[in-house]
Amino acid sequence: SSDLDVDRYTVEGIYQQVYLAARELNIEKLPPAAQESWVNSRLQYTHGYGVVMTPAVQGGDEPITWFVRDIPIQSDFGVKVGRPGIYYGEGKYQYVIAPNEIGEIDHPQGNTNVMTDYTGGGGVPLDSILRKILFAVYFGDRNIFFTTKTTSESRIIFRQNFVEAIQIITPFFLLENDPYIVTTSDGLFWIQDAYTLSNYYPYSQPYDTDISERMFGDLNFNYIRNSVKIVVDAYNGDIRYYISNPADPIVQAYRRIYPGLLKDMEEMPQELRKHVRYPKQYFTVQMSMFSRYHQVNPILFYQEEDDWEFIEMNYGPLLPYYLTLNLLNPQKQEFILVSPMSPTGRDNLRSLVIAGCDEENYGKIFVYSFPKGEQIFGPAQIIALINQDTAIAQELTLWDQAGSRVIFGKMIVLPIGNSILYVQPIYLESAYRLKIPELRRIIVSQGDLVVMDRTLED
C-alpha cells in the first residue's frame, strides 16, 4: 500500500503529468494465519513490488490507460522500472531476514509465486552467533537466534521506513510531509524534501497561520529554507543528501560539522534530477506570508486593503497543486506548482501564483494578479454556477437517484491565454459494487459559461 504521487515523465516522446503509486508490502493485509507465522512474516514476505502509473489526463467513460501495470510489471509505453523490489518505503514495517534458505516471495504468477533472494546491502549481516544473540535481545524475539533458515549471506533488515531513518540520522532537518517515488532504469528511488529552520532571524515575522499548525504542529520559526533533497534507494536503503540551496548558511554549517554527508546537487544522477520539484509545504508557507507582504504601498499594507487568502472550498482551503502546462514558455510543457488566491473574506479570484519545478525555472515565482476592481469568478462562485445550471443539475440528480453517489473532485484553475478556465471533475461511486470512484464527466467553466462533457477535449 502507498499513497498516490504526482510527477512528470516523458512517455513515448511526450512530456506529461502522471500519477503513480508504489506497491509497498502491507503485512496487515495478509490472512491472519500468515501474519501469525514467523516464517511468513519474517522470511518470505519481505518486500513490496514495483509501481503502477497512469497519465493524469483521462477521459470519462473510457478504459483507464496504464503506463505501468500488472504483476509482473508490464509497460506498453516503454516506461522503465529497474529492480522493482521495495524493501524501504513509507509504510509500517517489521524486521525481516533476507536472503534465507526458504526464499522470499517476489510476486505471484499464475497459481504459483516467483521467489527471489535479496542481493542488496541494506540491513546488518547475521553472520555470527554474537550478532544473532544481540538482535534476538534487541527485538525480544528468540526466533532470530534459534532459526536454522539463515545463511552466511543473510542480513537482518530493519528501520525500513525511510522517513523514520532520516529523522534518526539527521534530526535537525524538518521533512516535507509528502515524499514521492521515482522509477528509473536503475531502480526505484524515494525523493524527500528537507528544510532548515530558525526562530532567530532578525526582524522577521514568525510563521503562525490557520494552516501552520496542521502542517508543522507546534514548531515555531521565522526562517525556513528548502535546502536539502534526500534520495533513498528503495532496494538498498542507501540515503543520500544533496544541497539544493547552497546560499543557506545553516546547511553550510551542517556541511562543515558533518563532512561528507551533504553532496552538491550536481552529483545527483541526472535521471533523478529530472524529477526534483518545488515542494508544496514550502510554497504554502511562502504564499501564507506573501498574501500580506505583496503590498508594497505602506498605507495599503497597514490598512490591509489588499490582503489575500487561500480560496475556501467545501473541503477546506484550496492549497497549491501541481500542473503540467506551457504557461511559462508557450513552446514547452513545464511542471509547475499553482496557488490561486482570493481577497480576504471574498470569493472572487485575485491572483494566480506559480512556482517553477523544472530545472530551467526551478524556484522562480511568477505572480499573475488581476486588477482589484475586476471581478473574476472564483471556484466557490463557479460551483454556484454549476448548481444553477438546470441541465447539469438534472443529470447529476438522475445519477444520485440511480444508486450512485456523485463526487465533486478537486477543482483545477487553469490560466488559458488572457482568461481563466475552471475544470471540475465529476466522479461516480457505486452504492453496490466495489466503491472505487469512476471519472464520468468534466465540467468546464469560463466566465459565466458552464459546459459538461465526457472529456476535456470534447
Identify the residue ranges that each predicted region occupies:
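Soluble extracytoplasmic regions of secretory-pathway and membrane proteins
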Residues: 2-458
